[in-house]
Amino acid sequence: MAEKNNSVIPSGKVVYNSSIVRSIIELAIPKVEGVVNNFQPGNSSKNYIKLEFLENFNVAVDVAVTIYYGYNITDVAYNIQQSIKNNVEAMSEYKVGTIDVHVVDVIFDGSEHE
C-alpha cells in the first residue's frame, strides 16, 4: 500500500500519496540532457528510484540512470540532482535532502545495451 503523508493548512488538509513524489521524479529525470529515458511502467532493470520519507516533509532520493556516451557524467548527475530538487520542491510540500545518483550504464551510438 502506498505511504501517505498529511499536512494541515488553515483551509483544510492536503494528503500526499508517496507515488506522487515518484511520478514527479520520473518526469524530471528524462528532461536532463544526456539521460536515456527508460522510465516506463514495469521497467526497473536499468533505472530505479528509491525514496525515504523523513520527518518534517523531508525526503531522501536514490536514483539510477543510464546516460548517453559523450556527456560528462559529473555534469549530468549534478543536473539530475537539480532537476529532482527543483521539481519536487516546486510541486509538493516536500524538501529534498540527499539525492544520490548512480550511473549504471552508458549507451554508445544511440543503441541500448541489453
Regions found by a protein language model. Give the residues of each.
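N-terminal, polar/charged subdomain of small-to-medium soluble alpha/beta proteins
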Residues: 1-42, 46, 112
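Mobile acidic interaction elements
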Residues: 27, 54, 66-74, 91, ...
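Short edge beta-strands and adjacent turn/loop segments
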Residues: 32-66
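A short coil-to-beta-strand element that immediately follows conserved catalytic motifs
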Residues: 37-40, 96-100
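Envelope-exposed proteins and targeting segments
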Residues: 57-61, 71, 97
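Short, non-transmembrane amphipathic alpha-helical segments
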Residues: 73-92, 96
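Short, highly charged C-terminal tails/helix-capping segments
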Residues: 98-114
